[in-house]
């Protein structure tokens, strides 16, 4: 069994995207969501 690492357990701060969703890019920078799914980047998460 694997223990979650610190990197995987950090939750992204989505507040910077709330008012500026149009600034979300499609750059690939995978992030693991708290739901166990991998998202393309923090903005898409």
From Swiss-Prot:
Q: What is this protein called?
A: Caltrin-like protein 1
Its function, per the record, reads: Inhibits calcium transport into spermatozoa.
Question: Which positions does UniProt annotate with glycan attachment?
Answer: 13, 41
PROSITE patterns in the cross-refs: KAZAL_2
What keywords would UniProt list here? Calcium, Glycoprotein, Secreted
Instruction: Just give the chief location class.
Output: secreted
What are the Kazal-like domain coordinates in residue numbering? 8-45
Which SUPFAM superfamilies does the entry mention? Kazal-type serine protease inhibitors
Compartments where found: Secreted
**GO CC term, one of those recorded:** extracellular region
The record ties this protein, via InterPro entries, to:
Kazal_dom, Kazal_dom_sf
What does the PTM comment of the record read? Glycosylated.
């Amino acid at each position: 069994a694997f223990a979650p690492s610190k990197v995987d357990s950090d939750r992204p701060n989505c507040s910077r995207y709330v008012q500026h969703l149009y600034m979300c890019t499609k750059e690939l920078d995978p992030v693991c969501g708290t739901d166990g799914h991998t998202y393309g980047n923090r903005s898409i998460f």
